[in-house]
């Protein structure tokens, strides 16, 4: 799990199902096997390979960030969430996911699926887009983030929110944390 491969997959998976991303990811990696290849590519080449995934700002930001990584870091990913989050199209959660999965850095994540999971698990009132609610969710995400097996935890918590704790019709009987879920208890 290199930072580059994790980064590209995380960006592709934003607002897009895994089943859709798989083929695109492989074609992208075949054309741009590393950050240097992506940075050297023409923007039109990048957008062409993105055709069908939608949300083209993701592809443009990916390309810009690749160039920034090569120009400022020699093609290496920075070591801190704060530095990674300065790259175009990467926020705190995506930066955390990249570093946790590729380098084992202890960094909480809070994508849409994790927000939903934590909101339900702790019956956090309010809309997650409001700053006080988001701050509370970050606190919870920080508390749950373990000290070991960061890649496994990060993938598991995202998958739990994406597959069981879904927006519509969550599968509570199959959920491993259902016994502690305050939303289910209500």
Segments predicted by a language model, with ranges:
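Catalytic cores of DNA base-excision repair glycosylases
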Residues: 1-185
């Amino acid at each position: 799990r290199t930072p580059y491969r994790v980064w590209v997959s995380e960006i592709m998976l934003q607002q897009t199902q895994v089943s859709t991303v798989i083929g695109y990811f492989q074609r992208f990696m075949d054309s741009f096997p590393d950050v240097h290849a992506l940075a050297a590519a023409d923007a039109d080449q990048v957008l062409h390979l993105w055709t069908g995934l939608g949300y083209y700002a993701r592809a443009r930001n990916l390309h810009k960030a690749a160039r920034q990584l090569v120009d400022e870091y020699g093609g290496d990913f920075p070591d801190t969430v704060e530095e990674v989050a300065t790259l175009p199209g990467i926020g705190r959660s995506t930066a955390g996911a990249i570093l946790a999965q590729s380098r084992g850095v202890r960094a909480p994540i809070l994508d849409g699926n994790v927000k939903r999971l934590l909101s339900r698990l702790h019956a956090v009132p309010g809309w997650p887009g409001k700053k006080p609610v988001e701050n509370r969710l970050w606190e919870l995400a920080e508390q749950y983030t373990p000290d070991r097996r960061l890649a496994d935890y990060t993938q598991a918590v995202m998958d739990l929110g994406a597959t069981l704790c879904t927006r519509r019709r969550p599968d509570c009987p199959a959920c491993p944390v259902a016994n502690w879920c305050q939303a289910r208890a209500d």
